[in-house]
Amino acid sequence: MKNSQAVTSLTWWSVVVAYIVSTNSRLYIGWFGVLLFPLIAVSTVAYVAAFILAPPVDIDGIREPVSGSLLYSNNIITGAVIPSSNAIGVHFYPVWEAISNNEWLYNGGTYQFVVLHFLAAVLAWLGREYEYSFRLGMRPWIYLAFSAPVVAASAVFVVYPIGQGSFSDGMPLGISGTFNFMLVFQAEHNILMHPFHILGVSAVFGGSLFSAMHGSLVTSSLLSETASYDSLNAGYVFGQEDETYAISAAHGYFGRLLFQYGSFNNSRSLHFFLAAWPVIGIWCTAIGVSTMAFNLNGLNFNQSLLDSSGHVVNSWADVVNRADLGMEVMHERNTHNFPLDLA
């Protein structure tokens, strides 16, 4: 009897394991997926509930709560999950650390709950990509590419609040909250003049340009496999071994149009470049945010130009600095009267 139960139990577990690691399923689960799906479900439900229902949060720790939910007079644009209170700092603040659920909500415990579960889910997705690639015998470039947004999110939601000493400095989880975070970040750290941020911007915009160029070149040089009155697409099947476009013709065109040495005649080199450019740039952005988290800020050229009499000749850097002062004065206006860190 015991042997029969053991065999039944073993068979049941074998079926579960086979389903989890199967690469033939419509949706690959994987061992990391066992973590991923519950985590992303919990964080999504908590986020939606907080966005709709959460009471105001004492974000600055001065007993002046800020509302972020739809129930408290916000809309889709102004709504957000408000970061944890400055009174909590960088302490881990699960619900059992508060005296009551009302206190936990008042101090913004929902923010930590959503952010930490979401980041854990994103890391599980990263691991799932590696696991799936490994089981298919693929190299781990997809996993490596996705590491860029993972480290960027980690820099914004974890490293920056830790460096600043409080989760209240984290990015609010909403549309206007994101823009508010960006403006305050510029005011306090001059991110526009940080070399790593400049690299990140060139990567994102450059990557968009290169992708558009590549796509237009490919679709303009498809090899015709059909009669003139049939669709060009009818001559191809998914996964075919033959080339679908003439790379030499496409990049010969590009080389003559713009720059001879800016074109590729090797498909692998081309696609590696298209992947590496934005990934490396976003890595640089994450490094930049992480350094500014500890106040290693952007370059400062304020009042750097003087005339022969020693008077300041205002430059664009001084205009930006004046704007930064204005944004900093408006930020946390009830907490301080003037930004001493920029005075």
Swiss-Prot record:
Keyword Transmembrane found: yes
Site residues (Stabilizes free radical intermediate), renumbered to this chain: H189
Localization annotation: Plastid, Chloroplast thylakoid membrane
Protein name as annotated: Photosystem II protein D1
Any single Gene Ontology cellular-component annotation: chloroplast thylakoid membrane
Residues annotated for chlorophyll a PD1 binding in this entry: H197
Any one biological process term the GO annotation gives: photosynthetic electron transport in photosystem II
Enzyme class of the recorded protein, top EC level: oxidoreductase
TM segment ranges: 28-45, 117-132, 141-155, 196-217, 273-287
Catalytic reaction annotation: 2 a plastoquinone + 4 hnu + 2 H2O = 2 a plastoquinol + O2
UniProt xrefs under HAMAP family: PSII_PsbA_D1 (MF_01379)
Cofactor note: The D1/D2 heterodimer binds P680, chlorophylls that are the primary electron donor of PSII, and subsequent electron acceptors. It shares a non-heme iron and each subunit binds pheophytin, quinone, additional chlorophylls, carotenoids and lipids. D1 provides most of the ligands for the Mn4-Ca-O5 cluster of the oxygen-evolving complex (OEC). There is also a Cl(-1) ion associated with D1 and D2, which is required for oxygen evolution. The PSII complex binds additional chlorophylls, carotenoids and specific lipids.
Function statement: Photosystem II (PSII) is a light-driven water:plastoquinone oxidoreductase that uses light energy to abstract electrons from H(2)O, generating O(2) and a proton gradient subsequently used for ATP formation. It consists of a core antenna complex that captures photons, and an electron transfer chain that converts photonic excitation into a charge separation. The D1/D2 (PsbA/PsbD) reaction center heterodimer binds P680, the primary electron donor of PSII as well as several subsequent electron acceptors.
Binding site for [CaMn4O5] cluster: D169, E188, H331, E332, D341, A343
Residues bound to chlorophyll a ChlzD1: H117
Listed EC numbers: 1.10.3.9
Residues at which pheophytin a binds: W125
GO molecular function: chlorophyll binding; electron transporter, transferring electrons within the cyclic electron transport pathway of photosynthesis activity; iron ion binding; oxidoreductase activity, acting on diphenols and related substances as donors, oxygen as acceptor
Reported modifications of this chain: Tyr-160 forms a radical intermediate that is referred to as redox-active TyrZ, YZ or Y-Z.
